Amino acid sequence: MTPIQNAQQIFNRQHKNLPEITVYAPGRVNIIGEHTDYNDGFVMPCAINFGTAISGAIRDDHIWNVYAADLDETDEFSLNVEIPKSEHKWANYVRGVVKFIQERYPHFQQGANLVISGNVPLSSGLSSSAALEVAVGKFCQQLGDLPLSHTDIALNGQKAENQFVGANCGNMDQLISALGQENHLLMIDCRSLETTPTPVPQDVAVIIVNSNVPHDLVTGEYNTRRQQCEEAAKFFGVKALRDVSVEQFQKREAELTALSPLAAKRARHVVTENQRVLDAVEALKNNDLTCLGKLMEASHDSMRDDFEITVPQIDYLVELVQLVIGKSGGARMTGGGFGGCIVALAPHDKVDAVRKIIADNYEKTTGLKETFYVCTASQGVRVI
């Protein structure tokens, strides 16, 4: 059963009524451009065919009653008083989104009953949190008939995660969940918010493999990386590392390394990664999978050696995939790091061989069982 069917059926069962509003927002996978979004840089994700659905109906008071079907937990809060934090982590994503929509539209105090159901794996780096934030934002927009664009909904979700949940994420995850296009990757300029759709080549599969090494960005080292990038930007006298070219970085690399070796390594990743995203757009335009594969490999090496966010299990998965696909595609870690998933672009006729080499070796070597997905690039948030 899909999340949409699940949310609708459970709502019907709980409230003896059909839902008035159903919305759906997808998770995402980032093909290239990691930890560049909060440096005002470039990213190239696609929305995937896993996501979060919300079914709901209006109430005649100011209360939101929210049931998370997959966790079997309920949260309840009022919209006509200051919204406090919940002890349930998932509930804070919902509360944060509503709180910041109320900041924009103080008259928005409409109560509702909601059922949430999703199939984005939690803590996998596929943006279950952004899918939830964008779905809640779209639900609010429909419920209150609010003049919110999909970009507004995305940025509101990011604000909720930064200021209410406490994860200092960039804006990529929410933007792609809101703006994704079917069968396209979306190059996003995280400063101007300009998007450039790039078709996924027809003969290419988007493969995601979850290492099942869990990660938690709020308590992890994500925020430290962000501080190190800000330190490097200050050294270059710019607003963000987006404003430093590869040539400019190389000229002053030794000077920065002497001052702060770690900030220099982090900056080298971000500056070169931004260039790799721009090069990847060209490679895809030219249907040059060999070039794209090299860029993805360089991106992974940079995350491993300079940004230091991969773990041995992830490195091993990438090695296994590269053995099979060779020069006909690419593989790299995707997401915040410290666990999560790898992404590969490979010809459809290599998918079974990739699945087999991982099934034969990964669990035997690491003691962890992988989860294997073949995804399609999907449309962003929508009303059902």
From Swiss-Prot:
- SUPFAM superfamilies given for it? GHMP Kinase, C-terminal domain, Ribosomal protein S5 domain 2-like
Catalytic activity as recorded in UniProt: alpha-D-galactose + ATP = alpha-D-galactose 1-phosphate + ADP + H(+)
Which organism is this entry from? Haemophilus influenzae (strain PittEE)
Sequence positions that bind substrate: 34-37, 222
Query: Per the record, where is site Transition state stabilizer?
Result: 28
The molecule here is called: Galactokinase
> What is this enzyme's EC?
2.7.1.6
What are the alphabetically sorted keywords of the record? ATP-binding, Carbohydrate metabolism, Cytoplasm, Galactose metabolism, Kinase, Magnesium, Metal-binding, Nucleotide-binding, Transferase
**Name of the gene encoding the protein in the UniProt record:** galK
Role: Catalyzes the transfer of the gamma-phosphate of ATP to D-galactose to form alpha-D-galactose-1-phosphate (Gal-1-P).
Subcellular localization(s) per the UniProt record = Cytoplasm
- Source organism's superkingdom? Bacteria
Q: In which pathway does it act?
A: Carbohydrate metabolism; galactose metabolism
Family indicated by similarity: Belongs to the GHMP kinase family. GalK subfamily.
Q: Name one GO cellular component term.
A: cytosol
Its BP terms in the Gene Ontology are:
galactose metabolic process
Question: Binding positions for Mg(2+)?
Answer: 129, 161
Return the Gene3D superfamilies for the record. Answer: 3.30.230.10, GHMP kinase, C-terminal domain (3.30.70.890)
One GO MF term on file is: galactokinase activity
- Family annotation (PANTHER family): GALACTOKINASE-RELATED (PTHR10457:SF7), MEVALONATE KINASE/GALACTOKINASE (PTHR10457)
